[in-house]
């Protein structure tokens, strides 16, 4: 069956776009001019083009509230509305609320770009962020206390994966280019080292953990994937890909199901109970370009993949051989940019991803904005674009917290928190 392709230029009338004024921000908060991409052409022409594009985005309609959520719940209780229609109503209401989302917290604690991001599983205002220098910040932006900052080794210490320990949420797992996968506490103590390459030529690029099965899985730059128990026992170590394993993901509902994504242009699906060698995968999903990420949906029924060029795919567990949707979207690879990865919303059937406009694409318009794009997971249609002129860089990582009401984005050195917030509590946290 031919996959349904959704051009990224195809926008629904029901699209909400967030545009924020720079007037609230002081000159010291704006992105340094040296970091901005140079644009050829007269200033007057550039200003005109940008204003026209902003005006076009502003004219897009915001989804209207079709009915009361309370009424929808009541109709469902009476059996007059299906669960699917109730979910659609809740999603539409959430999309309407996105129109009022804004950056209300900001931090820039690192001297190198951010490389990884993880939300705390039980504290909706707490997240961990890692940097290219190996630094890790544990930040509860809901309180005024200073964040926990764990200093890394600097060059060569890039944090490639972060996961909180669900069995002890004052601990976290981390994989790094330093050549280790480890368990640490918030004081910086290393409690256990799961893998150590002891070589500068081998490092670990990806990480996932299952609290239910008590296993840790990590992938390295040589194509190996290692499965360990949380007490440190190695269960197996196999070369599953020809090149770097950029991402590993355990299915949240069936944690014996593993997805691995590689720059060898494949994503593979594995059954951990039946792995006997590199050829014992259940499915191999070929891509046209190297793959940055493969993420299971919260219900475990679908898989979202992001390549290193301009394609996002959605696969269904009922039909692995062909993607349900191909979404054309610019997010090309660049050496000094943290790879862009699309993620699922934690509650709704939505996909969130940062945009890196590509002038080589026919769909690219002059001075296209670096927005955060939100797509419908079923149709592949763009539903919303978030943009703040005060934070105009490329957001490589974007993830909603477990409650689904707050979005964290990383943009170069910066960490941005988007949410609905009253003006009286809007405060920017500068360098911490």
Swiss-Prot record:
Main location, first listed in the record: nucleus
Gene Ontology MF: a single term: ubiquitin-protein transferase activity
Region (Required for interaction with DDB1): 68-79, 87-98
Keywords: Acetylation, Chromosome, DNA damage, DNA repair, DNA-binding, Nucleus, Repeat, Ubl conjugation, Ubl conjugation pathway, WD repeat
Assembly and binders: Component of the UV-DDB complex which includes DDB1 and DDB2. The UV-DDB complex interacts with monoubiquitinated histone H2A and binds to XPC via the DDB2 subunit. Component of the DCX (DDB1-CUL4-X-box) E3 ubiquitin-protein ligase complex DDB1-CUL4-ROC1 (also known as CUL4-DDB-ROC1 and CUL4-DDB-RBX1), which includes CUL4A or CUL4B, DDB1, DDB2 and RBX1. DDB2 may function as the substrate recognition module within this complex. The DDB1-CUL4-ROC1 complex may associate with the COP9 signalosome, and this inhibits the E3 ubiquitin-protein ligase activity of the complex.
GO cellular component: cell junction; Cul4A-RING E3 ubiquitin ligase complex; Cul4B-RING E3 ubiquitin ligase complex; nucleoplasm; nucleus; site of DNA damage
WD repeat coordinates: 116-151, 159-194, 203-238, 244-287, 290-329, 343-386, 396-420
Pathway entry: Protein modification; protein ubiquitination
Residue ranges of the region described as Photolesion recognition: 334-336
Tissue specificity field: Expressed in bone marrow, liver, lung, muscle, pancreas and spleen.
Gene3D superfamilies: 4.10.640.30, YVTN repeat-like/Quinoprotein amine dehydrogenase (2.130.10.10)
GO biological process: cellular response to UV; DNA damage response; nucleotide-excision repair; protein autoubiquitination; protein polyubiquitination; pyrimidine dimer repair; UV-damage excision repair
Compartments in which it is found: Nucleus; Chromosome
Signal peptide: none
Description of its domains: The DWD box is required for interaction with DDB1.
Knockout mutant characteristics: Mice exhibit elevated susceptibility to UV-induced skin carcinogenesis and enhanced rates of spontaneous tumor formation, particularly for lung and mammary adenocarcinomas. DDB2 is haploinsufficient as a tumor suppressor. The spleens of these animals are enlarged due to enhanced lymphoid proliferation while the testes are also enlarged due to reduced rates of apoptosis of testicular germ cells. Fibroblasts from these animals are resistant to p53-dependent apoptosis induced by UV treatment.
Entry protein name: DNA damage-binding protein 2
PROSITE patterns, per database record: WD_REPEATS_1, WD_REPEATS_2, WD_REPEATS_REGION
PTM per Swiss-Prot/TrEMBL: Phosphorylation by ABL1 negatively regulate UV-DDB activity.
Modification N6-acetyllysine, positions: 35, 77
Positions of the UniProt region annotated as Disordered: 1-31
